[in-house]
């Protein structure tokens, strides 16, 4: 690591102008949360592998900012050369730089890896001390990274209409209407999942998220896709030709954005497409007829710098909300995917319960007793990785399976307190029947993306562990049972999941819920359920998906999280105050909760009824996928409970 920092500091000194500091973001050219191996620059320089974070290298210091999900992981992975900066507790990176770097300091960042929003915010902060943000045109990290992985060459795959549910031409029509409404003549699309959604295409360029490295531009009469043409088969080319989409090289996007700015970007299909004929009838609002729509959160500064800032509409992409509002076909597919996925999770729990009893002498999923301290042989012992591999194999046997939706968080004991723990084969823990086991996992299916967390104990949980699990469960149920007026955002609802924990002075450092894509990214906006102010931006709306995942974590001891995916539906209420209309949630995740971890005396009658109803549905819905042994286990796991049980 010292050699990497030393090499970067040499490049910083020789840069023109010389750099006093270098920022290395987590994001790629598309501001993605999950990036390809080739784009993990921040991980390369720091050794920290979490999905969120930012590295800052000065002449004498190296600091890494990350959020509460990764505090423990960062402490474990960072060398002594690095200082951990805790987001939400320590100063923001721009505040720290403004306060600690000298006046007129030059602060460098790759202009392709920083968003318009971030670059503008930093620029304003630095101006207080005449500091300058230097957006470099080449990435200094790439010059140091001699073993950088090659570019991904996975093919562009057309996503069938039977799963997408809405044609590209209809999406074009909707978006062009929004362009007209905003007085814009074009939209620059940088987010990978937005490009995939708009053109009904998928790929495997990024692990766990079925997207292709590509940009897009949509105007009132043309459509462009910027992708490495070697990824586009003859069949895919025919598909794009039929849509009137011009395919250009990935690297052409920056010159074409400059052409777009001067209204000189012309498609060879422009005069042939139905979209063009429709566009001739569209009258752009005369007061601002020349604006270009750019999402400041997903568009990189490199592209934005080619535009006339006076003629740019900086606001969230219209695709983000359209993608979040699932069509009927997507909703049906997501629900079906969660049924198959739930079956795999239950089959996994049945297998794991049997293995823990057989190999470790555990009392098992249903009984409370300390293990007999039986030890398996070296070849038969279970680890966090070997058991998660079993779960993946069970998922892989299900129809339409295409891979995992994120690295499985298979965590025992103190590892479960690391919120986004990722076990490695060489350095993972062995399963322990006397410790809590947390498994947060998900999969990609052609008809939907899944995300589920269950926490279990195969021995005798302590009273404190039960107390904490029960509080998490009560918050999970409270949020899932909420009814609320239309226009309500996730910031308002977040307290429902935390209140039972707050009663004991407990809390958790992550958000409570995120949107889930339709065979796309497992983390999807623009909505969320969270304590963070950004959760105020977009209200929850019918047909959105959102997770319900409160938790509690004790460093060095254990972690608990429960997670289901919910669909937002219209609610039938007795009254309709303010004529707003009301919404409610529908659970679409199916796997039992471990009753022996719940203090039933702490549950209300409503919570008991909800648990019994959910378990009854769970049993009936998953029954067709179970063999006799699995069905017997599931029946036992979903038996009705009462306060006196």
Swiss-Prot record:
Annotated EC: 3.4.11.9
Membrane topology: Peripheral membrane protein
CDD domains for the chain: APP
Keyword field: Acetylation, Aminopeptidase, Cell membrane, Cytoplasm, Endoplasmic reticulum, Glycoprotein, Hydrolase, Manganese, Membrane, Metal-binding, Metalloprotease, Microsome, Protease
EC supergroup of this enzyme: hydrolase
Cofactor(s) listed in the protein's UniProt record: Mn(2+); Zn(2+)
Recorded GO MF terms: aminopeptidase activity; manganese ion binding; metalloaminopeptidase activity; N-1-naphthylphthalamic acid binding; zinc ion binding
Binding residues for Mn(2+) 2: 451, 514, 549, 563
Residues the record lists as binding a peptide: 69, 420, 514, 523, 549
Cofactor note (record): Binds 2 manganese or zinc ions per subunit.
GO terms for biological process, alphabetical: auxin polar transport; proteolysis
Domain of life: Eukaryota
Post-translational modification summary for this protein: Glycosylated. Also present in a non-glycosylated form.
Pfam (any one): Creatinase_N_2
Tissue: Ubiquitous with preferential expression in 5 days-old seedlings, roots, flowers, inflorescences and rosette leaves (at protein levels).
Subcellular location field: Cytoplasm; Cell membrane; Microsome membrane
N-acetylserine, modified sites: 2
Reported regulation of activity: Inhibited by EGTA and apstatin, and, to some extent, by the flavonoid kaempferol.
Quaternary structure (record): Homodimer. Interacts with N-1-naphthylphthalamic acid (NPA).
Protein name per its UniProtKB record: Aminopeptidase P1
Source organism of the structure: Arabidopsis thaliana (Mouse-ear cress)
């Amino acid at each position: 690591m010292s050699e990497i920092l030393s090499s970067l500091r040499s490049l910083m000194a020789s840069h023109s102008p010389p750099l006093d500091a270098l920022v290395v973001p987590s994001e790629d050219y598309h501001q993605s949360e999950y990036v390809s191996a080739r784009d993990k620059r921040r991980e390369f320089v720091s050794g920290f592998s979490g999905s969120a974070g930012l590295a800052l290298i000065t002449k004498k210091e190296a600091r890494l900012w990350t959020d509460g999900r990764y505090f423990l992981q960062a402490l474990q992975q960072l060398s002594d050369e690095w200082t951990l900066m805790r987001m939400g507790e320590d100063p923001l990176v721009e505040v720290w730089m403004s306060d600690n770097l000298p006046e007129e300091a030059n602060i460098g960042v790759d202009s392709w890896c920083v968003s318009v929003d971030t670059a503008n915010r930093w620029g304003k902060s630095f101006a207080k001390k005449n500091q300058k943000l230097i957006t470099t045109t080449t990435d200094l990290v790439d010059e140091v990274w001699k073993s950088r992985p090659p570019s991904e060459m996975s093919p562009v795959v057309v996503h069938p209409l039977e799963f997408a549910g809405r044609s590209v031409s209809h999406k074009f029509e909707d978006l062009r209407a929004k362009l007209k409404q905003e007085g814009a003549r074009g939209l620059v699309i940088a987010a990978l999942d937005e490009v995939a959604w708009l053109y009904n295409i998928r790929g495997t360029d990024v692990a766990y998220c079925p997207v292709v490295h590509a940009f897009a531009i949509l105007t009132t009469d043309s459509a462009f896709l910027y992708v490495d043409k070697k990824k586009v088969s003859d069949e895919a080319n025919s598909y794009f030709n039929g849509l009137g989409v011009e395919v250009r090289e990935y690297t052409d996007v920056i010159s074409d954005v400059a052409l777009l700015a001067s209204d000189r970007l012309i498609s060879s299909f422009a005069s042939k497409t139905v979209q063009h004929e429709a566009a001739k009838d569209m009258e752009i609002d005369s007061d601002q007829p020349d604006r270009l729509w750019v999402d400041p959160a997903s568009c990189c500064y490199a592209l934005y710098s080619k535009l006339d800032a006076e003629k740019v509409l900086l606001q969230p992409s219209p695709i983000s909300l359209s993608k979040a509002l699932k069509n009927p076909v997507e909703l049906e597919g997501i629900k079906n995917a969660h049924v198959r996925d739930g079956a795999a999770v239950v089959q996994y729990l049945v297998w794991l319960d049997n293995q823990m009893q057989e190999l470790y002498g555990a009392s098992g999923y249903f009984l409370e007793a300390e293990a007999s301290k039986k030890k398996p042989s070296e070849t038969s012992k279970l680890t966090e990785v070997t058991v998660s591999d079993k779960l993946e194999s069970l998922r892989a046997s299900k129809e339409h399976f295409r891979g995992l939706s994120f690295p499985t968080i298979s965590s025992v004991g103190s590892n479960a307190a690391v919120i986004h723990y990722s076990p490695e084969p060489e350095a993972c823990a062995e399963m322990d029947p006397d410790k809590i086991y947390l498994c947060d996992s998900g999969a990609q299916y052609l008809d939907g993306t899944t995300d589920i967390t269950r926490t279990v104990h195969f021995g005798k949980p302590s009273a404190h562990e039960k107390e904490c699990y029960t509080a998490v469960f009560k918050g999970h149920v409270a949020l899932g049972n909420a009814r609320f007026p239309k226009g309500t955002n996730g910031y308002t609802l977040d307290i429902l999941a935390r209140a039972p924990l707050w009663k004991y002075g407990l809390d958790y450092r992550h958000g409570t819920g995120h949107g889930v894509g339709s065979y796309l990214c497992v983390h999807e906006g623009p909505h969320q359920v969270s304590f963070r102010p950004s959760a105020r931006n977009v209200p929850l709306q019918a047909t959105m998906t959102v997770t319900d995942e409160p938790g509690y974590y004790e460093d060095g001891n254990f972690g608990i999280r429960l997670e289901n995916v919910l669909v937002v539906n219209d609610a039938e209420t007795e009254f309709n105050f303010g004529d707003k209309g009301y919404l409610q949630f529908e659970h679409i995740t199916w796997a039992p909760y471990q009753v022996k971890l719940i203090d039933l005396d702490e549950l209300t009658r409503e919570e008991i009824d909800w648990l019994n109803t959910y378990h009854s549905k769970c049993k009936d819905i998953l029954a067709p996928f179970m063999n006799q042994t699995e069905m017997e286990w599931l029946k036992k796991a979903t038996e009705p409970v009462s306060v006196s049980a």
